[in-house]
Amino acid sequence: MSRADDDAVGVPPTCGGRSDEEERRIVPGPNPQDGAKDGAKATAVPREPDEAALAAMSNQELLALGGKLDGVRIAYKEPRWPVEGTKAEKRAERSVAVWLLLGGVFGLALLLIFLFWPWEFKAADGESDFIYSLTTPLYGLTFGLSILSIAIGAVLYQKRFIPEEISIQERHDGASREIDRKTVVANLTDAFEGSTIRRRKLIGLSFGVGMGAFGLGTLVAFAGGLIKNPWKPVVPTAEGKKAVLWTSGWTPRYQGETIYLARATGTEDGPPFIKMRPEDMDAGGMETVFPWRESDGDGTTVESHHKLQEIAMGIRNPVMLIRIKPSDLGRVVKRKGQESFNFGEFFAFTKVCSHLGCPSSLYEQQSYRILCPCHQSQFDALHFAKPIFGPAARALAQLPITIDTDGYLVANGDFVEPVGPAFWERTTT
């Protein structure tokens, strides 16, 4: 095979000469440039070797063949460190290893914070409240820094160790045949060998530690909710201890307990919650109310302050108290089995959306529509808060209410269904 024939199939100038055996394995076809000049001839590719010749090819031969089959010409390719083992190369290797190890450290920190950091809300008592408030920021900080550190390490490795290469490829169509798969594997193997990662034990170990810790922390963070038993009865109620998901601040702790519908005052120089009477609301209005007991106090003592904080922070506590206009009462449709849950013109629905637990906090007075701004679910307050638009599939849970002997609005029992989004064990629809 002549050098002219070798040039005709586009051998990259960096590949060098070939043995007679190699020349016999790759049989050239017509020159692609001639086909382009003629305009009538299709672009030709090298004739493919048979299976025996393909199996006998070395990785470098497969690499060269793959380039020619794909119409790839390597214009430039040089290693980053022509001389191995220099001090500069070692410094570059250590800098990459540092970033990868940092990724592992932050990934391990994410795992430890998720497992052991105090995440449950407790009433403010100085230092413990501050530690609790750091839980979510620390999740995001350690997760983000772990990803960032590994990414910086990967980018630095590419810039400092992967050979510099400029390749030019002609556009063409082709299917993934056996020969294509073998040559692609050869290219990947060449890239792996050229990256010199095999002999860089420190970087390999650092990468393994970084990705391992990051992956473990991420896996535990996502699977943690599936590992913990959510049905452990820990909340004392009038019917015995129950799991957290079955309860809220409106759940009576003993038979006959009075739980008032209280509005938040938003002031610091007075009680944070005050009881409500029917005359405190205008017709058509909406008020957010919270569960308040006489034993919760007015916040003047440390114990009372803690209890009131728990009321305000309870995720299933906020309730929308809506007063229907007398002229619109005839349009009200009550839910089956809940016909007595309202007190005259007053209806109380949870503020926790039945879609994903977001706060459905917007209310349109003229149409009696309740809107969750997160995913645009809408509920009709005239039709037992049934969803009429958006992804929510269930009505908002309704709280039974009445009035006590002193004329204050009180809960007439607990929610008869879980508050918020669905879960597997839920049977109500």
UniProtKB/Swiss-Prot annotation:
Source organism (scientific name): Mycobacterium tuberculosis (strain ATCC 25618 / H37Rv)
Residue ranges, annotated region (Disordered): 1-45
Assembly, per entry: The cytochrome bc1 complex is composed of a cytochrome b (QcrB), the Rieske iron-sulfur protein (QcrA) and a diheme cytochrome c (QcrC) subunit.
Transmembrane portions of the chain: 96-116, 137-157, 207-227
Record: residues binding [2Fe-2S] cluster: 353, 355, 372, 375
Domain Rieske: 316-410
Further remarks about this protein from its record: Was identified as a high-confidence drug target.
GO-annotated molecular function: 2 iron, 2 sulfur cluster binding; metal ion binding; monooxygenase activity; oxidoreductase activity; oxidoreductase activity, acting on paired donors, with incorporation or reduction of molecular oxygen
GO cellular component terms attached to this protein's record: peptidoglycan-based cell wall; plasma membrane
Cited function: Iron-sulfur subunit of the cytochrome bc1 complex, an essential component of the respiratory electron transport chain required for ATP synthesis. The bc1 complex catalyzes the oxidation of menaquinol and the reduction of cytochrome c in the respiratory chain. The bc1 complex operates through a Q-cycle mechanism that couples electron transfer to generation of the proton gradient that drives ATP synthesis.
PROSITE patterns: RIESKE (PS51296)
Cofactors, names only: [2Fe-2S] cluster
Gene that produces this protein: qcrA
Cofactor: how and how many bound: Binds 1 [2Fe-2S] cluster per subunit.
Recorded family membership: Belongs to the Rieske iron-sulfur protein family.
Name of this chain's protein: Cytochrome bc1 complex Rieske iron-sulfur subunit
Disulfide pairings: 358-374
Record keywords: 2Fe-2S, Cell membrane, Disulfide bond, Electron transport, Iron, Iron-sulfur, Membrane, Metal-binding, Oxidoreductase, Respiratory chain, Transmembrane, Transmembrane helix, Transport
UniProt subcellular location: Cell membrane
Signal sequence segment: none
Membrane topology (UniProt): Multi-pass membrane protein
